[in-house]
């Protein structure tokens, strides 16, 4: 039996769901194949979305017309804006979600997309002819043919789980691994390697002594992920904090010989910024304690996630260590922590569209590209889905630049630098952080999403209305003057220099000690101007305030970004045989030959390519 589609998406995780949704919504007849339709968009690790830089990615997905933002809002059981101690440019939203409701919301969303079919089966073999993808053969013997195929298989490709000395093949606990599929891809010259990740123990909340823990409440203000969706409506639940201690560390150290990470059982590299508890002990031997966060998995379950206690040690050692934490002295666990090794593919063999450089019509997204995190996966999935649909329609690839989005930074890092450990996004990876704020993803991307056919007309109209009100507030502040007697009492209270004469309101807004909230208390006209916005009043005010506070920084970053854009316009793909260019350094020749960057800007970001190497290429290009 053979099924025919425009786009085939393999894997129903966070990357696959966004890819399938994007492809179908932009006009491609799409099939999403997954091993278990009841575990679509499963949160395999922490039931949370967002965080530092990750929250910005989710807002970018939403601004383009993707699904993750509004689904997170609909299933959030605790919301917080991180980094509030820093300026608004560094703020990052994060939400704790109800795991089961998140899956149901995703399934409901996908079921309502007209051009999307979901099939429960397993990819067994990639079908390729003349370096062009044809589709796949499945475990049950059918063939699915497609003009474009997107691989979003997560940790399932030759997945191997570890708890102590026990090793079990699987892509997730109690779910089978996928064999043979990696090999069917690798035989076409695509490089495959191994990575490792892990997850903590899950605890029965009825066995926890919460009186021994510190409660951590969420925030109930106007912030959310979606620029267009409804606000979160589920009951908001607290998280709880505690810490390990010297006795816990002693028990864990005694068990290091049984840890797969230290007995030679696991050789793959795990995520640097989400280490296991045993790795923390080895890396920071002088630390007496490490913080732990007990987080609810939903409103209708007793299951709780112990953030900070990822481990692959034997079950009995994990449990004994937990019992020496006062709040967890009687803890009962649903399942222990475990590690998992899995296959990934070298992302430097991808174009910025996430299409393979070796097989036409084949796209990769998510953990199979060497990333870690739901948000990173979803962002890649969205781009891969858009480009798979564009490929079918013979349209230009959709590529986001580093000054346009964190998703653009992510994909550029993957395709030009590659990975030697699971890649996680941080604000520090972006050189244009002021341009990539969480408050302005709609300003950067909603128009693009609308023209792609992904963002709805209603969403686009709302953005145009919001933009009008942001500019109205900014114009009001630039045209309104403030006298010293109106404001100096406030300036003295907040510790900033008083006015000596009449000053424009926009100049006061730019001061770090001042904001719309405290200024509105002294200036009724500002309060009235803000209130004129018809809805999402506070969100609009926040965006206007951020643009005024960072005006100078925004202008400087834009000038620098425009200079770099000139290098982006100089295409070098196919122009050179790098191995023969002896004016370049040896390392440069090797890297350029292996990665084959498409533009001079991409070449400049490859580790080992120096400014002098770029100058040589510029001269050879006649620039």
Model-predicted regions and their roles:
Residues 2-15:
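Beta1/beta-strand and adjacent pyrophosphate-binding region of the FAD-binding site
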Residues 21-125, 140, 152-172, 176, ...:
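Conserved N-terminal/central alpha/beta ligand/cofactor-binding core
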Residues 36-38, 54, 81, 183-319, ...:
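An anion/pyrophosphate-binding glycine-rich loop and adjacent beta-alpha core
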Residues 3-5, 139-148:
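Core beta-strand elements of the Rossmann-like FAD/NAD(P) dinucleotide-binding domain
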Residues 127-143:
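Conserved beta-strand-loop-beta-strand element in the redox core of flavoprotein oxidoreductases
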Residues 10, 143-154:
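Short hydrophobic core segments
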Residues 429, 435, 446-615, 619-623:
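Extended, charge-enriched "interface" segments that sit outside catalytic cores
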Residues 305-371, 399-412, 537-591, 596:
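A glycine-rich dinucleotide-binding beta-alpha-beta segment and adjacent secondary-structure elements
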């Amino acid at each position: 039996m053979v099924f025919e589609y425009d786009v085939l998406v393999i894997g129903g995780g966070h990357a696959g769901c966004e890819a399938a949704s994007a492809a179908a919504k932009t006009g491609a007849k799409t099939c999403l194949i997954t091993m278990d339709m009841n575990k679509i968009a499963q949160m395999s690790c922490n039931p949370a979305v967002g965080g530092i830089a990750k929250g910005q990615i989710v807002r970018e997905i939403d601004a383009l017309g993707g699904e993750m933002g509004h689904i997170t809002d609909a299933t959030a059981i605790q919301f917080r804006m991180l980094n509030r101690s820093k300026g608004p440019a560094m703020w990052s939203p994060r939400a704790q979600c109800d795991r089961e409701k998140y899956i149901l919301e995703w399934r409901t969303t996908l079921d309502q997309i007209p051009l999307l079919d979901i099939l429960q089966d397993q990819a067994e073999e990639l079908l390729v002819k003349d370096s062009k993808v044809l589709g796949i053969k499945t475990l049950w013997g059918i063939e699915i043919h497609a003009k474009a195929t997107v691989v979003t298989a997560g940790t399932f490709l030759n997945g191997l789980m570890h708890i102590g000395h026990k090793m079990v093949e699987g892509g997730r606990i109690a779910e089978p691994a996928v064999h043979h599929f990696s090999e069917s891809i690798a035989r076409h010259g695509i490089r495959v390697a191994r990575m490792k990740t892990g997850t903590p123990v899950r605890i029965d909340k009825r066995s926890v002594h919460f009186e021994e823990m510190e409660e951590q409440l969420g925030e109930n203000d106007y912030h959310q992920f979606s620029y267009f969706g409804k606000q979160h409506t589920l009951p908001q639940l607290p998280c709880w904090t505690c810490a390990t201690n010297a006795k816990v560390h002693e028990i864990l150290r005694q068990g290091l010989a049984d840890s797969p990470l230290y007995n030679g059982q696991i050789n793959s590299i795990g995520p640097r910024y989400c280490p296991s508890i045993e790795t923390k002990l080895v890396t920071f031997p002088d630390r007496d304690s490490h913080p732990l966060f007990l987080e609810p998995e939903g409103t209708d379950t007793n299951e709780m996630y112990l953030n900070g206690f990822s481990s692959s040690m034997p079950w009995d050692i994990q449990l004994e260590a937990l019992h020496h934490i006062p709040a967890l002295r009687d803890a009962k666990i649903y399942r222990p922590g475990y590690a998992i090794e899995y296959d990934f593919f070298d992302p430097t063999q991808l174009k910025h569209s996430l299409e393979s450089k070796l097989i036409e019509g084949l796209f990769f997204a998510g953990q199979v590209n060497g990333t870690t995190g739901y948000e990173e996966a979803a962002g890649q999935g969205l781009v891969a889905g858009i480009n798979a649909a564009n490929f079918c329609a013979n349209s230009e690839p959709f590529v986001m630049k580093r000054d346009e989005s964190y998703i653009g930074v992510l994909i550029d890092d993957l395709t030009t630098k590659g990975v030697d450990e699971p890649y996680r996004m941080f604000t520090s990876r972006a050189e244009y952080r002021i341009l990539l704020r969480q408050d302005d993803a709609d300003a950067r991307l909603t128009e693009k999403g609308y023209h792609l056919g992904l963002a709805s007309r209603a969403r686009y109209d709302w953005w145009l209305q919001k933009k009008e009100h942001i500019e109205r507030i900014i114009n009001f502040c630039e045209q309104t003057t403030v006298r010293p007697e109106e404001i100096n009492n406030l300036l003295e209270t907040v510790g900033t220099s008083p006015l000596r004469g009449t000053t424009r309101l926009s100049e006061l807004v730019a001061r770090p000690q001042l904001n719309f909230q405290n200024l509105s208390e002294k200036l009724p006209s500002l309060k009235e101007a803000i209130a004129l916005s018809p809805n999402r009043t506070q969100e609009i005010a926040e965006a206007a305030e951020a643009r005024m506070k960072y005006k100078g920084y925004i202008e400087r970053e834009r000038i620098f970004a425009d200079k770099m854009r000139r290098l982006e316009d100089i295409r070098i793909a196919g122009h050179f045989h790098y191995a023969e260019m002896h004016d370049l350094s040896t390392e440069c020749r090797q890297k350029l030959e292996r990665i084959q960057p498409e533009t001079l800007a991409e070449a400049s970001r490859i580790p080992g390519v120096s400014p002098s190497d770029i100058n040589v290429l510029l001269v050879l290009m006649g620039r």
